From Swiss-Prot:
Localization (cell): Cytoplasm
Protein family membership: Belongs to the MurCDEF family.
Keyword Cell cycle included in the entry's annotation: yes
Pathway: Cell wall biogenesis; peptidoglycan biosynthesis
Functional summary from the UniProt entry: Cell wall formation.
Chain sites annotated for binding ATP: 117-123
Cytoplasm recorded as keyword: yes
Protein's recorded name: UDP-N-acetylmuramate--L-alanine ligase
Encoding gene, per UniProt annotation: murC
NCBIfam families: murC
Organism: Phenylobacterium zucineum (strain HLK1)
Length: 477
């Protein structure tokens, strides 16, 4: 396959932080299309190991000498200006390319679908890819999470379409000039970058209005801010979806069960026509995932995917790593790992957990970033209603300095003030298994929530619970 975005032979492209989920996907696509790729990261990971096997040169640790011989440097917002590789790149006058700019270059080569929204981007991107695959369109995919069906977050397809996750966190998603845009929802998030919610809303409107006159945007009419945006967007075609009776692609008769969600869909475009799908199966729990599936259905129908392929693609959807992923069952207690770290995401995940749990729902939360906890504190205090017990860990700083009065203790106090009946602070990760063992009984579901290293706790917990059960003792603090 020859999809080189420039007409020249260039040397190695160096990625600073190549193991990151967004960076690794772009690097993989470039490797698979014949580029020389190298990069550095602070520590080895599954992503760096995969890229190395594909031919990338990987450096562990950041050092100025790593960029010797590089043609250009790709970086993300997470990379600080004083990173030695960035300093050396500027000294050598190498092109410094933002991650979104490099993704935009790859998107230029195909018709593109960019999936945006405050929440649900990764899952929706994966669902769009799955249905297009089922319909024989074989898309290229660059996602913000590991797609279980691929075992990776990126895939080079032979078809005309590329499906990408559009990350709004630093505003650079506006560089992605897509043929098709998706907006799942718009909530207050990344206010450290945008300053206020009005700027967030304006960015998503610009994202939609970036599409060409022949493209379209699929937007979720269930979300009030998205619905309000539809009134402001001019000269661009919108396809609405949701459970809202006014949506053109809408779900009804939604049922949750052990196998996931079952629902029916009616498609009624405003210019006429009627299509219905009865009793679709999505092997994921939660109404929010039904909404994500509706986005994928809306896009697929516009691209001509058959109803049968849509049905098969959804039924076979294998999910995304860290999106309601079961890590094990110990003594009848199911342990689930989820990336949810915003109050809206947490509430949706816990509602899904409540729908499928045979017993209690126990939430373990590791707040992600002090600024997010501070800016959305009241929302955090109100988003755990579907959890019978909430266990609160220390904040995962993600490079931020602590903020006085913002942390584990304040969230515990806030949850209790908001009326939550059982909230427990986690003294240390080593004590989690003992605490869960005291709370959980067969049939209960324990969901670990956060974007930090809590995922490692989720994978360790089933074994630790089994060990405690076998020994009859308590975990060491």
């Amino acid at each position: 396959m020859n999809r080189r975005p420039v007409p020249f032979e260039i040397g190695p492209v160096h990625f600073v932080g190549i193991g990151g989920i967004g960076m690794s996907g772009i690097a993989e696509i470039m490797l698979r299309t014949g580029y020389q790729v190298q990069g550095s990261d602070a520590k080895p990971s599954a992503n760096t190991e995969r890229l190395e096997k594909l031919g990338a040169r990987i450096f562990i640790g950041h050092d100025a000498k790593n960029v010797e011989g590089a043609y250009a440097i790709v970086y993300s917002t997470a990379v600080k200006p004083d990173n030695p590789e960035m300093v050396e790149g500027r000294a050598r006058r190498l092109p410094l390319v933002r991650r979104a700019e490099m993704l935009a270059e790859l998107m230029r080569l195909q018709f593109s679908i960019a999936v945006g929204g405050t929440h649900g981007k990764t899952t929706t991107t994966s669902m769009v890819a799955a249905i297009l695959d089922a319909g024989g369109l074989d898309p290229t995919v660059v996602n913000g999470g590991i797609i279980n069906a691929y075992g990776t977050n990126a895939k080079v397809g032979a078809g005309d379409w590329i499906v990408v996750e559009a990350d709004e966190s630093d505003g650079t998603f506006l560089k992605l000039k897509s043929t098709v845009a998706v907006v799942t929802n718009i909530d207050p998030e990344h206010l450290d970058h945008y300053g206020d919610f009005e700027a967030v809303k304006k960015a998503f409107q610009d994202f939609v209005e970036n599409i060409p006159f022949y493209g379209f945007a699929a937007v979720c009419l269930d979300h009030p801010e998205v619905q309000a945006m539809t009134a402001r967007v001019e000269n661009r075609r919108l396809v609405t979806y949701g459970v809202n009776p006014q949506a053109e692609v809408r779900a009804h008769n939604i049922r949750m069960g052990p196998e996931g969600a079952r629902f029916s869909v009616v498609i009624q475009p405003r210019d006429g026509g009627f299509i219905s799908f009865d009793d679709l199966l999505l092997p994921m729990a939660g109404q929010h995932n039904v909404q994500n599936a509706l986005a994928a259905i809306a896009v697929a129908r516009e691209l001509g995917v058959s109803p049968d392929a849509i049905r098969k693609g959804l039924a076979a959807f294998g999910g995304v790593k860290r999106r309601f992923t079961t890590t094990g069952v110990a003594g009848g207690v199911r342990v689930v790992d989820d990336y949810g770290h915003h109050p809206v995401e947490i509430a949706s995940v816990l509602k899904a957990a409540r729908a499928v749990s045979e017993g209690k729902v126990i939430a373990v939360v590791q707040p992600h970033r002090y600024t997010r906890l501070r800016d959305l504190f009241e929302d955090f205090c109100a988003c755990f209603n579907d959890a019978d017990t909430v266990i609160v860990a220390d904040v995962y700083a993600a490079g931020e300095a602590p903020i006085e009065g913002v942390g584990k203790e304040s969230l515990v106090e806030g949850l209790r003030r908001y009326g939550h009946r059982r909230v427990l602070p986690l003294p240390a990760p080593a004590g989690l298994a003992a605490l869960v063992r005291e709370e959980a009984h067969p049939g209960d579901l324990v969901v670990l929530l956060g974007a930090g290293d809590i995922t490692s706790w989720a994978y360790a917990l089933p074994g630790e619970l089994e060990a405690l059960s076998a020994s009859g003792g308590a975990a060491a603090e």
